Amino acid sequence: MPITQIISASDSEAGPKPSISLVPDKPSEPETSPRHHRLSRSLSKFKRWRGRSNSSLSMGSSEQQELQDSPNEARSDDDENGYNNDNADDLAKSKYMMKSIAGLLTTASVYAGMNNAQEMNVLSQVDSEESDSSDSFQENIGQNEVKSKKENLKTKSHPEVPRLDKRKPTLFDFSITREKLSKDNVAKLRQRFCLDEQEPFLNDFPAWLLKDVLVQGHIFITTKHFLFFAYLPKNPRSVKMSGNLNIRTKLIRSTRYWCVLKNHLFSMYTSSTELYFPVLTIDLREVQKIETQKHTLNGSATKTFKLYTDESTFKFNADSEFSAKSWVNALKKEQFAAQNSENNSISLKIPLPNIIEIDDQPIVNKALTLRLRALESSQTYAIDDFMFVFMDGSGSQVKESLGEQLAILQKSGVNTLYYDIPAKKSKSSFGKETPATAEQKNNGEDSKYLNVPTSAVPSSENGKKSRFRFRERSNSWFRRAKPLEDSQVEDVEEIYKDAANDIDSSVHSTIHIHEQEDSQEQTVAWKPSHLKNFAEMWAAKPIHYRNKFIPFQKDDTYLIKETEEVSANERFRYHFKFNKEKSLISTYYTYLNRNVPVYGKIYVSNDTVCFRSLLPGSNTYMVLPLVDVETCYKEKGFRFGYFVLVIVIHGHEELFFEFSTEVARDDIERILLKLLDNIYASSAEGSNISSASLGDVQHNPDSAKLKLFEDKINAEGFEVPLMIDENPHYKTSIKPNKSYKFGLLTIGSRGDVQPYIALGKGLIKEGHQVVIITHSEFRDFVESHGIQFEEIAGNPVELMSLMVENESMNVKMLREASSKFRGWIDALLQTSWEVCNRRKFDILIESPSAMVGIHIAEALQIPYFRAFTMPWTRTRAYPHAFIVPDQKRGGNYNYLTHVLFENVFWKGISGQVNKWRVETLGLGKTNLFLLQQNNVPFLYNVSPTIFPPSIDFSEWVRVTGYWFLDDKSTFKPPAELQEFISEARSKGKKLVYIGFGSIVVSNAKEMTEALVEAVMEADVYCILNKGWSERLGDKAAKKTEVDLPRNILNIGNVPHDWLFPQVDAAVHHGGSGTTGASLRAGLPTVIKPFFGDQFFYAGRVEDIGVGIALKKLNAQTLADALKVATTNKIMKDRAGLIKKKISKEDGIKTAISAIYNELEYARSVTLSRVKTPRKKEENVDATKLTPAETTDEGWTMI
C-alpha cells in the first residue's frame, strides 16, 4: 500500500477524507497560448484531451513550474474523451488494501516500530544531544552497548575486516604504450616546427608540462632543438561538465542555477530544461584567475570557489569540497585551452644552445620533475622556466640525452649556455656570432646562436658573481589573455632562436599591439549612433550582412555597408561570447513572446539564432542552435498590426516572435528555412541531428577515471588538474592496477534485479568483479548472465501474502504484521552482513529499499552508492514516488513528502537496526541526522528525458539513463506470434501490447472481458500478456477466463526489447523498466498505475506528451485511450523524438562514469559516519586519515 493511503484516502477507493492535511501552495495562473494553425492547433487539441488546461508539451516544463511555490493546475476530472471519467467503474481496482512492495514494507515497519517506542524516545534524546555537540556523542554513545555485548562479539565467527590503518596504499605507476615515429609523423612535426629536412629526430619521451594545469604531451629532441607538443582535448561541441551551483552576490545571499561548461563558455540557467536562455555567461578567455577559497584557520579547501575577470569577481558555492574541486579543475582546463592553444594543440620550441640549466628532482616512486631554464632574449636577458613531470622515470634519460647533444654542439664550435658542460669557453666577445660550421651554414635560420660566455650565466656552481643581470620570466607565453594566432606562435618560437637580431618580434610588443586592438574594438562596440539606431528600431526593417552561406544581391536594399559590417559582427560576438567562426547573416527588431512580451533584437548567424532584450532592466538572452530547430512558419499576430513567426524546436515548446512589419517576418522565415535546408542536406541523418547545447554531458569513463585519478594525486599534495593528450598516435587510457570488488544489493521483484544485472555486466567489461546479492529465486537469472550470485533473506513476497489475506486493517493484521516484519527484517540484516563481510567488497551499491547497505558500508569502511528507479532524493520538483498526489500541489508539498517518508520509514526499522549495529556490526546507535542519507551518492537509472534532474539536486545525484538488459539476440519468437504480427500488418491494423504484470484484482474475469471489448471497439490487434488474477501466486493467472477473438493473442512473457519495436502502442502498469522499454521503442504509452512509483511514471508520461495516464480502467476508458494512442500523430511524433533521445543515451556507461567521479567523495562520506570503532582495542581515528591512506588500489596510465 502506498504511503499515500496511510495518510489519506485514494481517489480509487471509497473512504473518509484524509486525516492528515498537507496544505498545498496557492494555485498558479494557467498558462495561455495563442491560437494558431498547423502544429500549434494540434497541440492545443492535444492539451485538451490530456485533461490539462495549463500543461505544456515541452519536456521538463512542468518541473520548472513545480520548482516554484505555485503548483500547476490540477488534472481535470472531466475528460472530453471519457477515459478518465470519475463516474466510471475501475475494473482494475486492487482487491486488497496493501498494494505496493515499498508501501508494504513501510506500513509494516510502522506497526513494528510502535513496539519500540521506548527505544525511539531514547534515540530522540540522542538526536537533541547531537544537535548540541557531535563530539560528545562520538565519545559517549554506544559505549555501554559495546561493553555489554563484548562477549557476544568475541564469539562471532565472522572474519575480521581489515582496518584502514592496516591497508597499504599503492603508489601510482604510469606508462604510455606508443607506436614508433613513422615517416608521416616526422614530416608533420617538421612542418609544425619549421625544421630542416637535415635535422634528424634523436629521441622522444612522454612527459607532462606543468603550468596551471598538467598537460600530457611528448618531448622530441633533435640535433638542434628541444620540442614539446601536445594535442588538447577536441570536440568543442560537447559539454565538459554540468551541475547545480549556488552563486553568491552582495544583494542576494545565494541563488541556485544549473551550470554548463562547454568549450570556452561557462553558462548559468534557471533549470536543466531551459538551456536556450542563459542567465549569465562567462567567457573563460577573459578569466584571469580561478581558485578555491581556503579556510582562514587551517587552510583546508572549502565548498566555495571564485572566478576573477577584469570587470568583476564571481563567487560560487558547490555542494561539497569534492564538487568544488571538480569544478575548479574543469574550469582551469578549459581556461588553459582557451587562452593558450591554437588549432587544439600546444607546441614549444627551444634551440638547444639557449638552454641554461637542467635540474631534475624525484617526487614519488619513479616519478620526477625536470626543470628546464632557457634564455628568451638578449635584450631583456629574460629567462623562461619550464617544468616537466615524468611518471615513468624517463626524466633522467631526457636530461642525459640533452647533455650529450649539448656536448656535441659544444665540440662542433657552437657556444651554449648550459654550464654543466666541461667545454672550452669561447674567446669571442659577447654579442658576436660564433663562426659557423659547414653544417650550420647549410641550415640557414638555425646557423646563428647567441655567443654568451658561460661565466655570464647565473649558477650555484659559479663562484664569481655574474656581470649580467638576468630577469626571471613567468612564462608569459602560456598566460596570454587572448588565444594566439599561428603567426604569433611562430614569433614566440623564433624568440628563442633569433632574438638578438629580431627585436621587433618580442613577446612584449606583440601583446601590446593586441591589447590596443582589443580596446579599440571594444570602443567601437560601445559607440553606437543613437539617432540612427532609433530610426532603425522604429522602421524595424531587416538588416542583411555579406556572408558565404546566404548570398544577397549587391542591390539588396537591406544590405549593410561594408564599413559597418565588421563592427556589427564584433558586437554580435561580444554580446554572446562567440568566437570568430560565427558570422552574421541578418538581424531584426522584434518581440519575444513568452510569459510577457520582451522587446529586443534577433540575430541570425550561420548556425545559431540569438535574441537580446533592449529594454532597460531586462536581461533576456537566447542562444538557439539551428540544429535544434525543426521548422518555422508564419502566424497571425496576437495584437493588431503585428505579424508572428513560430519557431518549432525539438523537444521544447515553440517560440513566438512578433514583428511590426510583414516584410521582416517573411524575410527571417525565408532565411531560416534556407539555413535549415542547408543543415539537413549536409547531414546524412537529416532531422536526427542533435546538439550538445541540450546540456547532456558526454559521459566518458576515461574522463571519469581521470577525475578519480586527479582526486588521488590531489591527496598526495599535487593540486593541479590533468589534461590528457589526444594524440592519435599515442593512445592513452587509465586502468586500475587491481580489480574492484563490487557488491550490488537489492530486494524486490525481477524489475528491481534486472537493471543491476545490466550494470554488473558493464562493470565486468571494465575489468571488475561483481556479485549481485538478492533473493534465491533470481539465482538462475543472475548466473545466466555470467555474474556471481549471493543469497539473502528478506523476500517481500512473504509480507505480501500477509496483506493479501487481510482486506481491511484490523487488530489481528497489526499484530501479525508486527511480528512477521520483525523476523523478516532481522533475517535481512543478518544475512546481508554475513555476505558482505565474507566477500570483502571494495564498493557497495544498494537499492535504498533494502535498508541495510549504508550500515554495512560504515562497518566495512568502504564507498557506498545508492541506485534506484524512482524519486528518493529530497527535492521540490517531484513528490516521493509513494506519495504522489492526485493533483500537483507545488514544491513545498513535494519536499514534505520526502521528509515524511524518510521519518516514517526510519521509525519502523530504527529499533532493530540500532540493536543490530551494536551487537553485530560493533557500531554505535545512529539516527537520521548521523546517517547523512542525503549526502550519499545516488544513481537514478532513468532517462533524463522523463526524469530531468532537478535544480535542487546535489552534485552527487546523477540521472544516468536507463540500464537496459538486451535479450533480443537470444530470443526466438514463436511461429504463432510472428504469424499474428504479419496478419495485423497485412490487414493494415494497428498492433498494441497490453500487459499489467502479476497484479491481484477483485474480479479477473470482468477485467478480461472489459479488455476484449475495448480492443474490439478500438478496432486494433492486441498482443496480450495476462498476469492478473484474484489470488497472489495463482498458477492460472496466465490463462484467460473468456474466449479471445482472433485479433487478440495471449502470448505470455516476451522480451520487451524484441516485442515493442513490432507494435504501435503499449498499455501497461507503469513500472520503471516497462516504461523505459516502451519509450525506447518510441511507442505512445497508456499507463494504468496500481501502486508505488507507477503513479509517478503515469504522470510523467502524460506530462511530456507521449502517453495517457488512466485513472480507471473499463471497456470505454481503455477503448478511448487506445484510439488516441494509435491515431494521434502529435503523440506519435513526440514519442519518436523521445526514442531518438534515449537511443543516444548510454545509461550504463554514464553510471560507471559517475561511480568513478564520486568514488573518493563516497569514501569520505562513509568515513564521516564512522563514530565508534568495531572493537575498543581497534580504536582508529578514521576521520583523520587522508584518502591516500584509506585506499589500497592504484591506477595505471597506459
Curated annotation (Swiss-Prot):
CDD domains: GT1_Gtf-like, PH-GRAM1_AGT26, PH-GRAM2_AGT26. It is found in: Cytoplasm; Membrane. It is a peripheral membrane protein. The modification Phosphoserine is found at S76, S693. Residues 146-162 have a biased composition (Basic and acidic residues). Its main location: cytoplasm. Residues 52-67 have a biased composition (Low complexity). Its EC number is 2.4.1.-, 2.4.1.173. Residues 35-51 have a biased composition (Basic residues). SUPFAM superfamilies: PH domain-like, UDP-Glycosyltransferase/glycogen phosphorylase. Keywords: Cytoplasm, Glycosyltransferase, Lipid biosynthesis, Lipid metabolism, Membrane, Phosphoprotein, Repeat, Steroid biosynthesis, Steroid metabolism, Sterol biosynthesis, Sterol metabolism, Transferase. InterPro entries: ATG26_PH_GRAM1 (IPR048066), ATG26_PH_GRAM2 (IPR048065), EryCIII-like_C (IPR010610), Glycosyltransferase_28 (IPR050426), GlycoTrans_28_N (IPR004276), GRAM (IPR004182), PH-like_dom_sf (IPR011993), PH_domain (IPR001849). Residues 1-11, 452-461 have a biased composition (Polar residues). GO terms for biological process: carbohydrate metabolic process; lipid glycosylation; sterol biosynthetic process. Residues 1-89, 124-162, 427-465 are annotated as: Disordered. GO terms for molecular function: sterol 3-beta-glucosyltransferase activity. Residues 238-336 form the PH domain. It catalyses: a sterol + UDP-alpha-D-glucose = a sterol 3-beta-D-glucoside + UDP + H(+); ergosterol + UDP-alpha-D-glucose = ergosteryl 3-beta-D-glucoside + UDP + H(+). UDP-alpha-D-glucose binds at S749, R750, D752, N1025, N1053, V1054, H1056, H1069, S1072, G1073, T1074, D1093, Q1094. Pfam families: EryCIII-like_C (PF06722), Glyco_transf_28 (PF03033), GRAM (PF02893), PH (PF00169). It is an enzyme of class 2 (transferase). Residues 187-236, 570-636 form the GRAM domain. It comes from the Eukaryota. Belongs to the glycosyltransferase 28 family. Sterol glycosyltransferase responsible for the glycosylation of ergosterol to form ergosterol-glucoside. Also shows activity in vitro on other sterols such as cholesterol, beta-sitosterol, stigmasterol and tomatidine. In contrasts to what is observed in Pichia pastoris and Aspergillus oryzae, is not involved in cytoplasm to vacuole transport (Cvt), pexophagy or nonselective autophagy in Saccharomyces cerevisiae. This is Sterol 3-beta-glucosyltransferase. It comes from Saccharomyces cerevisiae (strain YJM789).
